[in-house]
Every structure is written in structure tokens, then in C-alpha cells.
């Protein structure tokens, strides 16, 4: 359910684009993201840093798209988000010696230490590649193709990536004794 809730602005962007074009769709995405953040705030009194970041990026790039009447800005939005994720994952591992993928997943998954490093690297590279692919589609195809790619192509690639990763993880997962603390795996 959270996955669909997170996709809410993207789905509305897609629908608005099909009906009224890129500028209306951009406005709809901005309003939907603000509404989404407001809903999360009123319901939980807390908003994740990633949601704030997403709001900031849609407001900046969506705003630039509307102010300058140039859809190039909104087309850069996914790339900026993907590249930020990739750089943060890679940078935190290299510079801070902190594996963010492990921090997010270790409660659910028990892996040998070297696998956590590989998993973090693979996610980082995936996000960097997705950012590049988004730009390729944005600059080599028309806006209609880019919008379809944004919803179906990037989501499809994400699902395939997660499925392949799940198969890979299943081969390396360790049994954790009942009641064991994930911190003990370190």
C-alpha cells in the first residue's frame, strides 16, 4: 500500500499529461506531492527525509519548468533524484564507512559482511545508471515517450532489478537464530 501511495504523484502526473500536457501535469505533480507530504505529516507527525527531498526537487524543477515554460527541467528531476541516491549510497560507504542499504535492511535480512558491501554498490550503480538512462530517453525521444518511460520503463526496470536482487539475496541469506539482534551479525 505504501508503494502505491508513494507512486500517487507519478500516476497523477501521467494521467494529467495524457489529458492536458506537460505543464498541467507538472503542476498536478507539484500539488500532489505537497498534498502527499501534508497527509503524511497530519497522519504521523513525521515526514521521512527522502519525502522532503522529493518535495524539494519537484518544487525546484517543476517550478523552473513552469516559470521558464521549458519541459527540460522536469525531465531532469528523476535524474537528479536517482543520482543523489546513488552518490549518497556510494559516498556514505566510501567516505563515512557506513552502509546505508544495510542500515535500511538489516532488520529483515541477514547477510555475510561482504554481501552488504556488494549490495550497497549494486544499488548505487543502479541509481546512477537509471539517472543516465532517464537523460538518454529525455534527450533522444519526444516528451510523450519520456512520460511513458518515467512511469512504465523506470518502474519496470526497478521491479526487474528488485526481483533479480531478491534471487541473488536468497542465495546468500543466513539463518538468524530466533531472538538474535541484527547488530550481532557485524
From Swiss-Prot:
The chain crosses the membrane at residues 3-23, 24-44, 49-69, 76-96, 121-141, 149-169. It holds the Pfam family IspA. GO terms for cellular component: plasma membrane. Keywords: Cell inner membrane, Cell membrane, Membrane, Transmembrane, Transmembrane helix. It comes from the Bacteria. Belongs to the YciB family. NCBIfam families: ispZ (TIGR00997), PRK00259.1-3 (NF001325). Plays a role in cell envelope biogenesis, maintenance of cell envelope integrity and membrane homeostasis. This is Inner membrane-spanning protein YciB. It comes from Ralstonia nicotianae (strain ATCC BAA-1114 / GMI1000).
Amino acid at each position: 500500500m505504501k508503494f502505491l501511495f508513494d507512486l500517487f504523484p507519478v500516476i497523477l502526473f501521467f494521467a494529467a499529461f495524457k489529458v492536458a500536457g506537460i505543464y498541467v501535469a507538472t503542476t498536478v505533480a507539484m500539488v500532489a506531492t505537497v498534498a502527499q507530504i501534508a497527509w503524511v505529516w497530519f497522519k504521523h507527525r513525521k515526514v521521512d527525509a527522502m519525502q522532503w527531498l522529493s518535495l524539494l526537487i519537484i518544487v525546484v524543477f517543476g517550478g523552473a519548468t513552469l516559470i521558464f515554460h521549458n519541459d527540460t527541467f522536469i525531465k531532469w528531476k528523476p535524474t537528479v533524484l536517482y543520482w543523489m541516491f546513488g552518490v549518497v549510497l556510494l559516498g556514505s560507504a566510501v567516505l563515512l564507512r557506513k552502509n546505508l542499504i544495510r542500515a535500511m535492511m538489516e532488520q529483515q535480512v541477514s547477510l555475510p559482511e561482504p554481501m552488504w558491501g556488494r549490495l550497497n554498490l549494486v544499488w548505487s550503480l543502479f541509481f546512477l545508471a537509471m539517472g543516465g538512462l532517464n537523460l538518454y530517453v529525455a534527450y533522444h525521444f519526444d516528451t510523450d515517450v519520456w512520460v511513458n518511460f518515467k512511469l512504465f520503463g523506470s518502474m519496470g526496470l526497478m521491479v526487474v532489478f528488485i526481483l533479480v536482487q531478491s534471487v541473488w539475496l536468497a542465495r546468500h541469506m543466513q539463518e538468524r537464530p530466533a531472538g538474535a539482534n541484527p547488530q550481532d551479525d557485524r
